[in-house]
Amino acid sequence: SFVMGFMRSGTTLTQEVLDAHPDVFVADEVELVPALKRELHGIEKRGTSTAEKLALLDQSGVEHLRDFYWQKVYDRFGETIGDGLFVDKLTMNTIDVGLINCVFPDSKVIFVMRDPRDVCVSCFMQLMVPTPTTVQMLTWAGTSRFYALVMAWWSHVSKQLTLPFLELRYENVVANFEASYRNVFDFLGLPWDASVVDFHKRAAEKFVATPSRTQVTKPLYASSVGRWRSYESDMATISVSLDPFIDEFKYRQ
């Protein structure tokens, strides 16, 4: 299964809750799917874009990519993954969800959502290591434009996915943690385990590879919901980018 979304949307929280379940192993921000995409571009010489190459790929090519992915998993984690559910959490796998749909058509995707305004405030104010992704968010306008590009892609591609996916709202998690994650575990075909309620205690004992590491080692709190209201005047300057998604995702109040 896969956990994805947009940065600062709550993917790390979901990762830690899932990882607290005894029958789940979560790979935290490990570039397994990006490696898979590079392998696709290496074995399929026809076409130029990832989509074109996937369309030209035969079944043996799909099976090769599937084997390649799992070899990467075992090279990295070995037998520590156990025999439970393996979850690949890389937030920006959103961009490559079409590749996932092709290679792993029986997998499940949890797509974590949050109010676009809170996402952009949090991304812009968070100190992040420079990467090809994070450099898109060095300015207020750049942050909103990048968010709009990624979420427009999700809005488009999610209608074409054949694999099952669940959209999980951060605000619902904060308002009703247990009901939200009971729904998640039911979607994944796993029984509820009360130990996940104390996810923050487990997270405090290990390394978390994202800027959210300080938040997920504490009990859940609601202060980050509606944080954008403190910057309401600044929101007007990026409304052209965010308004379509505020409406589409029903965050208009």
Residue ranges and their predicted role:
Residues 1, 46-85, 123-167, 175-253:
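PAPS-dependent sulfotransferases, especially Golgi type II membrane carbohydrate sulfotransferases
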Residues 1-104, 112:
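Phosphate-binding active sites in nucleotide-utilizing proteins
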Residues 26, 109, 165-167:
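Conserved beta-strand scaffold positions in the cores of enzyme catalytic domains, especially
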Residues 29, 169-170:
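A secondary-structure boundary/capping signal
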Residues 31-33, 116-119, 173-174:
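Conserved nucleotide-binding/hydrolysis micro-motifs of P-loop NTPases
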Residues 91, 172-176:
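Acidic, metal-coordinating catalytic cores used for nucleic-acid/nucleotide bond scission
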Residues 94-97, 118-119, 151-152:
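Conserved coil-to-alpha-helix start sites within the AMP-binding
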Residues 100-124:
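Conserved phosphate-donor/acceptor-positioning beta-strand/loop module used by diverse small-molecule
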